[in-house]
Amino acid sequence: MSQIPQAVRERADTLHQQLDDANYQYYVEDDPRITDAEYDALLRELQSLEAEHPELKTPDSPTQRVGAAPAERFEEVTHAVPMLSLDNAFDDAELAAFVKRVADKLECDGDTLAFCCEPKLDGLAVALVYENGRLVQGATRGDGRTGEDVTLNLRTIRSIPLKLRGDSIPPLIEVRGEVYMRHSGFEALNDRARENGDKVFANPRNAAAGSLRQLDSSIAAARPLEFCAYQVARLEGEDDAHSHSDYLKRLRTLGFRTSPLLDVVKGERGVIDFCHRLGEQRNGLDYDIDGAVIKVDSLRDQRELGFVSRAPRWAIAYKYPAQEQTTTLNDVVFQVGRVGTLTPVAKLEPVQVAGVTVANATLHNMDEIERLGVRIGDTVIVRRAGDVIPQIVGVVESQRPATTRAIEMPEHCPVCGSQTERLEGEVAARCSGGLFCPAQRKEALKHFASRRALDIDGLGEKLIDLLVEREWVKTPADLFRLEAERLAELPRLAEKSANNLVNALEAAKRTTLARFIYAIGIREVGEATAASLARHFGSLQALSEASLEALEAVEDVGPVVARHIHTFFRQPHNQETLEDLQGVGVTWEEVEIAGRPQPLAGQTWVLTGTLESMTRDDGKARLQALGAKVSGSVSKKTAGVVAGEAAGSKLEKAQNLGVEVIDEREFLQRLAHWESASSEDAQPTAPEDTP
């Protein structure tokens, strides 16, 4: 084991503490003091140090929230203290009866009794066990006595501390709480699913539960799960708490989030007022609650009251009325998302749901329509929860009229008229219009101008948004028609910046075929595939005229991608867009393909660290031009690794696997040799004499 320099060890400890503090400030205090970008920079620095010095990596490091190797199954966990359910109250009278029962049992005045009240989050209950301050086990509620060990998944949730904070750390503590998903995170998760053609979740609770039960914890790590603590079930060591609210205060000092809405109230009036007040706040929350939990605050009184069968006498759950109504589905229209995904939107007979008039609801995709069995004209059940878009959750088939009609996916985009496509295995249909489709215009232009595409310096996302909104730019070619005088009229874009942007646009006209193919945004055509297409066909015309069979013969191109490419070039408006770009002066050198050998064909190379003589992208392009595939990871099949300055874990892995490693000097020498040999062998033959 190599000796770690003291300065490195101290820096790692500092980063560890800074990241822990940032998590505490964000999730517990709700007072973030650094930006997301600053947090990410600290995390990347710690990851880099741990990659160079694996001994620094600890189970409670903030870097260990990315997930571990997939498990084969979840082990059963027997709860040391059963996770019991609560009795329910559905109105003020039942709340009053609960307070009276408690007061009678304790033989006291109900008006003087203190109750701790908090929202009942609609998620998944879990139990977390900490030994000497470190998380050792996390389990689901299960049937209340036996749950499942989901420790690896729970470790990925940033609002769950891997190591407890403070000086008074108990030898053992079991903390219970709810894993849930905010509406904002849920909508973003479903947006990504729609873009990728995956199934969407019906509601945040299902999303949270499904994420927590993934055998592959890296999936849970990518989901926006959160945790809120509500109970101390076991505690060993110093315990000076006299009330439930005392325990919740201690949980905050240990690093847990508790509900910011909890309150300690007195008597029947206080309990009823809290439930009414929370009910008024309910629709403005960024997460689902299905009620309130009312607990006798005194721990001594809790012990005296005890339990009846499956529930404690000292607590009750107040349930709010369901946020559902029935109405008529009048029609279905299809909206086009920023990457072309078609989403069916239900047009409803307006109905009041949870105090809000609902006239539209999402149907997600055609699979969901088929699952529901819904038809236009049906009486449907509509649910609304907080800020989540209202959705249809069922059909009242007993009220179905004879005049209903089926919902059909349009064959052409309702925005631009392009052909729609739905590939086998995908649940979403998409518009194939790409750059031509106004609904996709902003994102298509941002991709076109991005660093790995045409790399237009100074053309940021906000500026593109503004140019599209003012209708100054409708196609990529319009970018190259912009004039400095007009650009200078825009807010925060002075004359000098406007001139710089026009110069950058002029420079971007000179590109490569591979970059251009990538820039035009053919679905699923990334950098590597674009480079393969450029090498294989040599010109845009040859690529645009290629058959499906010819496309499938290209390295990295399978039947699905071939179909995307083929469809793109068969759309007349896409051809017009390409001709327009060439008309404003976008050019590239055509790639020589006839007779040009590729000395690195079939080889995979990896670039790591910083190169002084060129950028990594330039090095990658030169390797690809010689036939190599350039990968971002090292394996036994890697032919060689080019190691620049500050090469990290890829260098170490290559050395461990016995993969050849060369420095930049050797790389330049080999490039010169390979490119010279390729050029000499590729000399064109002299034309035959003509009579």
Curated annotation (Swiss-Prot):
It catalyses: NAD(+) + (deoxyribonucleotide)n-3'-hydroxyl + 5'-phospho-(deoxyribonucleotide)m = (deoxyribonucleotide)n+m + AMP + beta-nicotinamide D-nucleotide. This is DNA ligase. Keywords: DNA damage, DNA repair, DNA replication, Ligase, Magnesium, Manganese, Metal-binding, NAD, Zinc. Belongs to the NAD-dependent DNA ligase family. LigA subfamily. It comes from Chromohalobacter salexigens (strain ATCC BAA-138 / DSM 3043 / CIP 106854 / NCIMB 13768 / 1H11). The active site is at K120. GO terms for cellular component: cytosol. Zn(2+) binds at C413, C416, C431, C437. GO terms for biological process: DNA repair; DNA replication.
